[in-house]
Every structure is written in structure tokens, then in C-alpha cells.
């Protein structure tokens, strides 16, 4: 079967890499892809806001399944566009995608269904927000309601921080803002828990801990993710049962009641305190870099997982992961997540010899006539799996050192909560 992958990041390269190993996949097309995907797939530049144009191309190339990597096409209704047509789309429909498209939508579902989460206040203007903040306890969390590429969350230590965050959001930093979410700050440790679902059944698809802050020791500004380790050190049977019964199942039931059809990945962002889970956020796709970290440990053919979700037969598919540990270290452009330069040459990447349990997934890269260049804030993902987290991290960092890209920056402490040195 010919398969199309929508997206340009490290997540999409990892998906492409896994599908390329499947004997059931005859051809892969990436929309638009990156320099890494171009090595194993055909990159195609289309207007991804024009679903009809995408449909015509898929019909022309006999693409039978689309895998949607990023959230924007899902929130914009790509699944609804292809409903009832000959092309399957792996991903949730427009109603289901509001779980990520609107944090306020998700909070209201939590409130109605007694899903454990932080206390919150919805504010509809800057003045209302500031008035509320004057009588609030700190620290607290301020969130932009819509999509913000993982960067619309502010942890505010005092009134002044919160005021600045609110002004940035209402002044349009993440697009037009009509509402803002002010949340209680939850003390604990974060964990990401993943499932796949076919709309009726769901199955576990890995756990991880992302490192969002740009600086070592989890300091500095939020990013899309500087690295990740998997599995999470926090996960145990008792906690997992609580996550399923108190959070995932009530949410999926609520989506079904609203007429949504959820087929795809669900990323459950959690705060864990005293072995109790609290929902921080949902993402309606795999995380990035969690996807790059988890997929190399998957023993099952990824194509079988994706197609069974599309066809409603997930209960017939056994999903098996190795017991290996995995770490991804992200190499970024200097200056990220603020100002950074693009089109910086990356030399000798193809000279790096990878061992069996090592991968380099491209993200912000571009293949040009003069060679490989950077094309984004997060540039390359260095992934290693083994039976020891420290070895994973050391191996990933050694790969970065071999590249010796002087325009890059990376964190050396990925997995610091699980690695004691």
C-alpha cells in the first residue's frame, strides 16, 4: 500500500522510518517532509490547507492511507474532509481534535466528568484577567486557549510575570485570543502517557518524560521539546489503572457523546503527585520528541497498528514493545526558541556510522544543491536505545559530538531525573 505522511519534523521522519521497514508498505510520500524523509520517501510540496488538492494528489498516486503528524490539519478537519472516501486518514476528527485545539474545551470536559485536573478560571479579556490575578495565589499557570506549538504555557511566579504573560496572549502572540485560561499550579512530576484508539478500543502506546525548557536543569523558556526519555520512571500498575479509569475512559466517552470519532494517537500530559494522576493537557497526535524516542522500541509493524485503527479492528492487533530504554537528545539552532538563523550548512552527517540501536531523525533540515542546511529551530534528533539510560544518553551525545555542528545547541542532562551520576 502507498502511504502518505503529513508533516515536516522529527516525529514524521520517525514514522516514515518505521513504515519503511514494513513489507506491507510499497511507497511513502511525505507532505512536505524534510531532508531525512527524502532518503526513504518522496517529498511533496502542497498547500496543506487545501484538502481537495491533497485528495487529488493522493488519488493520482494511489495513496490509500494518510498519517497526520501535526495537530493543525486535524484541528482544521482533515479527517472530516476524507470521511466516506477511498483514502483512510489516521487521526481524530474535528470534534475530537478540540481536545488539543481548545484547552478550555478540555477543561469543561474534565469539569463535567470529574476528571482530576487543576482548578481553573476562564477569563475573556485582559482587564478581567488582571483583576482576577490581583487576588490570586502564586505560582500559577497561564495558558493560551488555542494551538501554540507547545509554547503557549506560562508558569508565573508572581503578579508581574502573570500580567506580562496575559498581555502577550491577548496581544496576539499565538493568534487572535478571545479567552485565556488561568490555572492552579500543580506540584509534582510530569509524565506523558500514550494510547492508540480505533474509536471503540484503545491500547497503550508508550510512556515518556519530555524536557520542555531550553536550559539544563529545566531552566529557561519553553520549547517544543529539547529531549526525552522512555519509559517514564513514574509508571506502575496502580498509577496506570488510575490513568485509564479516571482520565482516558471518561474522556473518550465524552467525545463519543458529542458525536466525535477518535481514531489515532492520544497524548495524555499528566502531573503525578503521590502516585495520583492529574491531567495537564491532551495532544491529539504523538508528541515530538516522544515519538522519536518511543517508536524505535516498537516490535510490532507500525503499519498494522495504523491500519487497524483506521479500520476499527485494533482489538485484533497485538502491540508489543521491547523492554529497552530510550533517550532522544534534540540538536537545536543556537538562539532557539527565540531568534535563530536558517540555511546554515550541516557537514558530514552522512559520515557518522550508526550502530544497530542508534538513529538520527531529521527535523528542521533541508536538502539543497549546496548540501544539507538547517531549516528550523529543532534540527536533528539523536536517539539511542539500550538496557541502561546513562548509556543511551552518552551514545546520543557522542553522535552529536561526532557531527561537531558549531551552530547547534543541545542539553546534556536529558533524563536527569532517572539517571543518577
PLM ranges: what are they?
Residues 365-369, 373-421:
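Generic C-terminus detector
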Residues 43-49, 121-125, 156:
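Short acidic-hydrophobic, aromatic-tinged amphipathic segments that line or gate anion-handling sites
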Residues 38-41, 98-104, 215-216:
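Short, charged, surface-exposed secondary-structure boundary motifs
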Residues 153-291:
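Internal nucleotide-binding/catalytic subdomain
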Residues 90-151:
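A conserved helix-loop-beta module that forms one wall/lid of the active-site cleft
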Residues 244-266, 283-355, 366:
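Active-site "cap" helix and flanking loop/linker of ATP-utilizing ligase/carboxylase catalytic domains
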Residues 1-94:
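ATP-binding N-terminal substructure of ATP-dependent carboxylate-amine bond-forming enzymes
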Amino acid at each position: 500500500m502507498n502511504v502518505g505522511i503529513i508533516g515536516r519534523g522529527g516525529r514524521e521522519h520517525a514514522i516514515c522510518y518505521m513504515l519503511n521497514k514494513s513489507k506491507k508498505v510499497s511507497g511513502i510520500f511525505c507532505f512536505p517532509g524534510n531532508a531525512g524523509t527524502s532518503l526513504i520517501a518522496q517529498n511533496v510540496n502542497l498547500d496543506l490547507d487545501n484538502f481537495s488538492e491533497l485528495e487529488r494528489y493522493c488519488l493520482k498516486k494511489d495513496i490509500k492511507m494518510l498519517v497526520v503528524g501535526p495537530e493543525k490539519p486535524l484541528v482544521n478537519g482533515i479527517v472530516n474532509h476524507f470521511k466516506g472516501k477511498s483514502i483512510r486518514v489516521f487521526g481524530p476528527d474535528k470534534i475530537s481534535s478540540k481536545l488539543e485545539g481548545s484547552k478550555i474545551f478540555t477543561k469543561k470536559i474534565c469539569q463535567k466528568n470529574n476528571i482530576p485536573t487543576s482548578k481553573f478560571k476562564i477569563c475573556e479579556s485582559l482587564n478581567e484577567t488582571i483583576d482576577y490575578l490581583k487576588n490570586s495565589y502564586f505560582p500559577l499557570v497561564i495558558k493560551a486557549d488555542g494551538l501554540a506549538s507547545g509554547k503557549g504555557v506560562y508558569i508565573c511566579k508572581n503578579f508581574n510575570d502573570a500580567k506580562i504573560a496575559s498581555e502577550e496572549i491577548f496581544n496576539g502572540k499565538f493568534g487572535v485570543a478571545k479567552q485565556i485560561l488561568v490555572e492552579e499550579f500543580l506540584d509534582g512530576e510530569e509524565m506523558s502517557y500514550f494510547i492508540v484508539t480505533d474509536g471503540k478500543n484503545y491500547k497503550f502506546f508508550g510512556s515518556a518524560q519530555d524536557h520542555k525548557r531550553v536550559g539544563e536543569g529545566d531552566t529557561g523558556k519553553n520549547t517544543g521539546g529539547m529531549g526525552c526519555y522512555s519509559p517514564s520512571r513514574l509508571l506502575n500498575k496502580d498509577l496506570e489503572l488510575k490513568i485509564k479509569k479516571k482520565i482516558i475512559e471518561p474522556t473518550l466517552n465524552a467525545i463519543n457523546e458529542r458525536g466525535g470519532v477518535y481514531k489515532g494517537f492520544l497524548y495524555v500530559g499528566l502531573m503525578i503527585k503521590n502516585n495520583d494522576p492529574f491531567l495537564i493537557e491532551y495532544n491529539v497526535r504523538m508528541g515530538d520528541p516522544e515519538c522519536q524516542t518511543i517508536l524505535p522500541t516498537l516490535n510490532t509493524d507500525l503499519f498494522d497498528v495504523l491500519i487497524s485503527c483506521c479500520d476499527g479492528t485494533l482489538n485484533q492487533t497485538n502491540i508489543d514493545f521491547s523492554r529497552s530504554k530510550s533517550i532522544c537528545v534534540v540538536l537545536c539552532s543556537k538562539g532557539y526558541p527565540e531568534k535563530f538563523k536558517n540555511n546554515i550548512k550541516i557537514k558530514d552527517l552522512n559520515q557518522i556510522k550508526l550502530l544497530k540501536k542508534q538513529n538520527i531523525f531529521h527535523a528542521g533540515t533541508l536538502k539543497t544543491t549546496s548540501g544539507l542546511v538547517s531549516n528550523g529551530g529543532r534540527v536533528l534528533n539523536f536517539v539511542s536505545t539500550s538496557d541502561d539510560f546513562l548509556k543511551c544518553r552518552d551514545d546520543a551525545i557522542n553522535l552529536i559530538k561526532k557531527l561537531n555542528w558549531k551552530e547547534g545547541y543541545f542539553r546534556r542532562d536529558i533524563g536527569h531525573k532517572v539517571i543518577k551520576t
